[in-house]
């Protein structure tokens, strides 16, 4: 008879005892070496985010074990949705359309609950079409996505999985599922995604900057850069002008991948540093806020560690440019009508190229957070007296980057439709 510890026989022991006991067991297991399980800073940061962990893998590869470890690690505010609970046999989804409908309804219901921060979906998730449905749901409820595949030694070995899977699938059955899981699923882009709290802090700082700039006498003299034609105007509302704003949490893009179709995407995704950093928490430093007639954003100063995740070919406007690596690092805070978010980084490079050429612009005064510089042509830079630090998770954005109806609310009212930028 096993006389080891159990919750039932040791009800007097606090819950935290079992949490520590179970988490300490993950330290020595290679298959559980993920930042979201091992790195305490990441664990703490994820508590401030809405995250959908989508597990992928062949039956018997260790997904369910991994899912339970995640739930056990985060406990409060965490829910697991498992295809097994809906009696879904791994394979083509067509035969289980009603079961998947119920699963998705339950998943969406959890997404709507304010008390749930972390959702874990346990299924094979081997079909692109199915993943795209899940990414759309994540967009709709403003959840960041982390794709997780087991690291067990047998995860792709059909002969071993035949013995391990609970569905008694044959090796041939497993081989049919394998092609969709052998290759990494690349996002639209990789980047650092800010926590909700950090996003709100930075949004507020950006809004105050726009309000102060719009009321500044030096800016009022340059209104023609923002107002078409000869329309007379004494002042303008920059918050409204930059009305095309990112929904949900803010982010700093590292590499645009276009789901693997962009040049260099596959090579970038295969880097060891990326694999080790995926789903890990970072602290980003913001040194300045800027405005141009097209965009407004925050300049990010990357650390040596963060620069390892920065592509080597994105800091140039022309082949002859020689700006330091990481120059383009930024967070888009808003765009003018009909302007795409990619323009924010280009605007920042223009400003930095001008600075490198010896023209830092004219200091025109002090705002609440630092010194204001006029750079000409409607470009303004607020150099922060004290750098801002924001917490973020490094992951991918897997959605379509198109307007989606969003659920949930924030101060100021519900967001009805947003464009992911």
UniProtKB/Swiss-Prot annotation:
Transmembrane segments: none annotated. Residues 419-421 form a propeptide. SUPFAM superfamilies: LigT-like (SSF55144), P-loop containing nucleoside triphosphate hydrolases (SSF52540). The modification Phosphotyrosine is found at residue 110. GO terms for molecular function: 2',3'-cyclic-nucleotide 3'-phosphodiesterase activity; RNA binding. Keywords: Hydrolase, Lipoprotein, Membrane, Methylation, Phosphoprotein, Prenylation, RNA-binding. This is 2',3'-cyclic-nucleotide 3'-phosphodiesterase. It catalyses: a nucleoside 2',3'-cyclic phosphate + H2O = a nucleoside 2'-phosphate + H(+). Exists as monomers and homodimers. The active site is at residues 251, 330. It is found in: Membrane; Melanosome. A lipid is attached at residue 418 (S-farnesyl cysteine). The modification Phosphoserine is found at residues 6, 9, 170, 359. Substrate binds at residues 253, 332. It is a lipid-anchor. Belongs to the 2H phosphoesterase superfamily. CNPase family. Catalyzes the formation of 2'-nucleotide products from 2',3'-cyclic substrates. May participate in RNA metabolism in the myelinating cell, CNP is the third most abundant protein in central nervous system myelin. The modification Cysteine methyl ester is found at residue 418. It comes from the Eukaryota. GO terms for cellular component: melanosome; membrane.
């Amino acid at each position: 008879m096993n006389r080891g510890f159990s919750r039932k026989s040791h009800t007097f022991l606090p819950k935290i005892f079992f949490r520590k006991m179970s988490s300490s067991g993950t330290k020595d297991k290679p298959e559980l070496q993920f930042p979201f399980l091992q790195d305490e800073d990441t664990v703490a940061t994820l508590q401030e985010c809405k995250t959908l962990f989508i597990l992928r893998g062949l039956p018997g590869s260790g997904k369910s074990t991994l899912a339970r470890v995640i739930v056990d690690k985060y406990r409060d505010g965490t829910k697991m949705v498992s295809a097994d609970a809906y009696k879904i046999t791994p394979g083509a989804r067509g035969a289980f359309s009603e079961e998947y409908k119920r699963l998705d309804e339950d998943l969406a219901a959890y997404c709507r609950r304010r008390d749930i921060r972390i959702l874990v979906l346990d299924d094979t998730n081997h079909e692109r079409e199915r993943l795209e449905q899940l990414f759309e749901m994540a967009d709709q409820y403003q959840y960041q996505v982390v794709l997780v595949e087991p690291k067990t030694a047998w995860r792709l070995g059909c002969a071993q999985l035949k013995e391990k899977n609970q569905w008694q699938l044959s090796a041939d059955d497993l081989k049919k599922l394998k092609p969709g899981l052998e290759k990494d699923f690349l996002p639209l882009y990789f980047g650092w995604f800010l926590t909700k709290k950090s996003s709100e802090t930075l949004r507020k700082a950006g809004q105050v900057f726009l309000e102060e700039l719009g009321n500044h006498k030096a800016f009022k003299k340059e209104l023609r850069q923002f107002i078409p034609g000869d329309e007379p105007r004494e002042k303008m509302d920059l918050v409204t002008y930059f009305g095309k704003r990112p929904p949900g949490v803010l982010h700093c893009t590292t590499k645009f991948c276009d789901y693997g179709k962009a040049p260099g995407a596959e090579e970038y995704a295969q880097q060891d540093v990326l694999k080790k950093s995926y789903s890990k928490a970072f602290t980003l430093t913001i040194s300045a806020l800027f405005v141009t007639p097209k965009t407004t954003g925050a300049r990010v100063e990357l650390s040596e560690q963060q620069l390892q995740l920065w592509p080597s070919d994105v800091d140039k406007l022309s082949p002859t440019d020689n700006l330091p690596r990481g120059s383009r690092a930024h967070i888009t805070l808003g765009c003018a009508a009909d302007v795409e978010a990619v323009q924010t980084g280009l605007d920042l490079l223009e400003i930095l190229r001008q600075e490198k050429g010896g023209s830092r612009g004219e200091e025109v005064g002090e705002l609440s957070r630092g010194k204001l510089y006029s750079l000409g042509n409607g470009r303004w830079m607020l150099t922060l007296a004290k750098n801002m630090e924001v917490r973020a998770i490094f992951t991918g954005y897997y959605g379509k980057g198109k307007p989606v109806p969003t659920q949930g609310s924030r101060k100021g009212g519900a967001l009805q439709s947003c464009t992911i930028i």
